[in-house]
Amino acid sequence: GEYGGGDVIVWDWGTWSHAKPGDPLKAIEEGDLHFDLQGQKLAGRFVLVRRDRDTSGKEQWLLLHKNDDSAVPGWDPEEHPRSVKTGLTNDEVAAAPEALWRSDLPAGEASVALGHSPPPVWEGPTEEELAALDALGKGGTWEVRGRELKLTNLDKVLFPAGDDGRPVTKREIVRYYAVIAPWMLPYLYDRPLNTHRYPNGVDKPGFWHKEVPSHAPEWLQQWHNTEADPGETRCYAVVDSVPALAWMANFGALELHAWTSRLPGVHQPTWALIDVDPGTTSTFDDVLVLARLYRTALEHLGVVGTPKVTGQRGVQIWIPIGEGYSFSDTRAWVEKVSRAVGHTVPELVSWQWHKDRREGLARLDYTQNAINKTLVAPFSPRPAPGAPVSVPIRWDELDDPDLRPDRWTIRTVLDRLAAAGDPLAPLIG
């Protein structure tokens, strides 16, 4: 945007709070304001101090970062010039006048509203960009949507062959993440991300990875969790672009789990999650019986939600939550509904926490409704042969005799979307 003849970006995004008792305006008048920031770039305790006036009589202020757990030695804001919203620098905004906000235009043309607005609409890679990816050797630099990505080991097999008899390479996963981005990014946008990495392929042990690595590109959006205890993750990736999603693929993050809360209000859930988690003796027919009972219960309650096959053995149900509810609220509500469903067919359900005590029965898991508890994101691959994908479905598809939890893969889900769309998409935002 433009303000007073200069270009302006949203350099950081988050919340602030006065750190001392009393009126913050009075603290400013007294020249000593202590406050806490919880932003995507700046976090921790800050002090704004008034110094002596300069020779012209103008006030001088000094901004200090206290030496707390959020302080990073040598961190220079000048080395992080990009907007947390657009990824652009001031110079790039100034060079793109069509992206500027104009005070002489109607307010109705503003592109960003305060609060949680619906996510933007993303365009996938061009045919030329995809052709360039296909033409790379085992590795190289790929330019996509204005960013350069250094890709490695593109011919490495990451998924064994599935029903079609063809294994899935890293190149194909990078390509999939890029082309699925317009469908997947709305579920990742403005949310901290937990990733399940399989850098050596899904037939080798994977591991959870949450902390942004030091070699991540500067333009990858990040969120600093100032509430993290020692030893916990402090810096999370926030995937909000086609290049960021493709970078995750190259990083070996083959399974993506976004938080159910959005920045900056990480304590306020936007989804309530129901997870029909099958036991060792549960059949998919058992899972469908339970999912249909949830369908009946939600219809009776007048609650809107959408089921999603997990890409492995289960079914999840995602329910949008309005403002004003806590994780305790959503967890208690999902537990109440789940116990009503479970008591209808007690022969299918166990309430035991440990899997080895469930006698092979399904668990109706309501405990994922908590901060930093996640379920696999829509359209994320799952670690199984053929690279199956977690896909939202319509309620009536629970009655489809051909439905399987791993029915769609990275090679078939785009045809599914072209034919049926995403039934969960209208509930985002």
Over which residues does each language-model region extend?
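SsDNA-processing nucleotidyl-transfer enzymes
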Residues: 1-22, 133-146, 150, 166, ...
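Short, conserved phosphate-binding/catalytic loop or strand-edge motifs used
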Residues: 309-319
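Short beta-strand
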Residues: 196-198, 305-311, 352-356
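C-terminal accessory nucleic-acid interaction domains of nucleic acid-metabolism proteins
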Residues: 57-59, 67, 71-76, 80-98, ...
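Catalytic palm subdomain of template-directed nucleic-acid polymerases
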Residues: 318-331
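Structured, beta-strand-rich domain cores
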Residues: 1-52
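Short, flexible loop/turn elements at secondary-structure junctions
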Residues: 39-41, 52, 67, 155, ...
